A protein has these predicted regions:
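Helix N-cap/beta->alpha junction signal
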Residues: 9-10
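C-terminal accessory helical subdomains adjacent to catalytic cores in phosphodiester-
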Residues: 1-4, 14-40, 47-65, 69-193
C-alpha cells in the first residue's frame, strides 16, 4: 500500500485521526504526503462524495487504500456498515481496497475507551478513579449518547479543540473501545493487503 485516504463524516473525527494515526500507522506514513484525512460536513455529504472520491483515487498512480469512517449514532451498526460497503463497492471501478469502519454511537466512545486521556484534559472535572469500574469506561461502546454523557460530566466544551486535546493524550494500545480497536485492525489489514 502506497497511500491511504480516510474519508470521515465530520471535522472533529478528522482532527482526532490527524493526531492518532501517526501513533497507529507504521513508521514512514506522513500526514498529507502518503496518508490523507478528508473531512465532510455530515453523513449525507460523506455519502454523496464516495462515488466521486473512489473514482478519483482509482485513477491515482499509487496503490491507494480507502477507509470510510462514520458515527453510528442511532443507526443499526451492521446495517449502516453494509449500506456504506455497498455504496463503496458500486463506486469502486478500479478497484481500490477499502474498509468501512463505524464509530460505535459517537466519537466520544473512543474518548471513554481511554479515560486517562479525558482526565488529563479535564483534571478537575473527570477522575478515572470515580468511573473506572463503571460501564462508562469498561464498555464505552455501550454508551448510547457518549457526547451527552461527557457534557454532563465536564460541561459544555469546544468540540474540535477538545477532540485534538484528548487525541494527543490517547494511548492507542490501551483503548477499551471495541469500535476503536476494529478501526485500528482495519488499518492494519488494509496496509497488509
Amino acid at each position: 500500500m502506497d497511500r491511504l485516504e480516510f474519508l470521515v463524516e465530520e471535522p472533529s473525527i478528522a482532527e482526532v485521526l490527524k493526531v492518532i494515526l501517526p501513533k497507529i500507522l507504521p513508521q514512514g506514513w506522513i500526514l498529507n504526503e502518503n496518508f490523507f484525512v478528508r473531512p465532510h460536513q455530515g453523513k449525507s455529504d460523506l455519502k454523496k462524495s464516495i462515488p466521486r472520491k473512489f473514482q478519483a483515487f482509482s485513477e491515482l498512480p499509487f496503490n491507494t487504500g480507502i477507509i470510510v469512517v462514520q458515527d453510528q449514532d442511532a443507526n443499526d451498526c451492521r446495517r449502516l456498515k453494509q449500506e456504506l460497503s455497498e455504496l463503496c463497492n458500486q463506486s469502486n471501478t478500479k478497484p481500490c481496497p477499502f474498509r468501512v469502519r463505524i464509530v460505535c454511537h459517537e466519537l466520544e466512545s473512543w474518548y471513554f475507551g481511554d479515560p486517562k486521556a479525558i482526565e488529563t484534559v479535564f483534571p478537575h472535572l473527570f477522575k478515572v478513579s470515580k468511573y473506572k469500574n463503571k460501564d462508562l469506561c469498561k464498555h464505552p461502546d455501550s454508551i448510547i449518547t457518549p457526547k451527552n454523557r461527557l457534557k454532563r460530566i465536564v460541561g459544555e466544551y469546544p468540540q474540535i479543540d477538545t477532540a485534538k486535546k484528548i487525541a494527543v493524550q490517547m494511548d492507542v494500545n490501551a483503548n477499551k473501545s471495541e469500535s476503536f480497536n476494529q478501526f485500528k485492525n482495519g488499518i492494519t489489514s488494509l496496509i497488509q493487503s
